């Protein structure tokens, strides 16, 4: 009988009562972050938004005691020890600069993507390094239960040497209004989940090859409404992402990893939010001789993974270590996103080292 304890849940620290100041009061903060924090017993103490009425509504729905009209006022509150940002990427650097300058702020959880450009992301990490502020990033797919389970199988060697991996998304994201002027939508705002998940599971690839096209169902200018990519690894592994954001029916996300000794496959439960269903994993090995293990759980990516992204930052503050998903972690992912854009614009395979070196990332 295979060991099916797959460590799908977050490993929370002993201290979870840091005062959290929330910047942003849209869907992701109101309906995902705050419910997850309350369920985990975390302590949101204040919230601010560009639209104060939204902040008041989110506070009432999620028992947040203080509401500020501006994020600057929130940062001045000495009860705020962790700043949780859910703002557009091109506005996060300014907030991080200000938050890191406050001596009572011990940590910052930035939304991904942390910035619109790789250069801004590098600057964000430098700012927090200079002040000693812990910078975590909300790469929440790393805490999707099926991804945690798959990572456990890979780390235990259950699947042998990975040969091919794939994430196939046929689901239509809701592109928020702030995204539309960017001109870059799928790779920067959706594929980044899958690119980062591949890095979490397998590390950095050597090269990326990308094909992308606009989504004909949208009337705003953009270059990448659909994105398809292959990550080429030094050991021969190929990780393939097919992000079809055009689809209008039968929304789903499937993934599969095949190794020399086993196969794992599963689904991501996100496309049917808000009704919601858990992600899944099925796996087998040569040793299991055709039997598939099919563990199941009640937790979902949205909102339960967000306990993990905040919890890993709290643990870093508690233990005075680098966050598991740190600013430096996201630099590798942002460099991969930059390489992906360069690949489809220039029609070539782009080495990841090319964009990392240009940005001065070790």
Predicted regions located by residue number:
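C-terminal helix-rich "cap/oligomerization" subdomain common to oxidoreductases
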Residues: 1-16, 82-84, 312-362
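Contiguous beta-strand/loop segments that form the cofactor/metal-binding neighborhood of enzyme cores
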Residues: 2-6, 189-275, 305-322, 338-339, ...
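N-terminal Rossmann-like dinucleotide-binding module
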Residues: 2-62
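Active-site loop of classical SDR/Rossmann-like NAD(P)-dependent oxidoreductases
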Residues: 28, 50, 298-311
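Short active-site oxyanion
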Residues: 42-46, 81-83, 185
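Beta-loop-alpha module in the N-terminal Rossmann-like domain of NAD(P)-dependent dehydrogenases
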Residues: 62-127
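Predominantly a Rossmann-like dinucleotide-binding segment in NAD(P)-dependent oxidoreductases
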Residues: 134, 141-220, 347
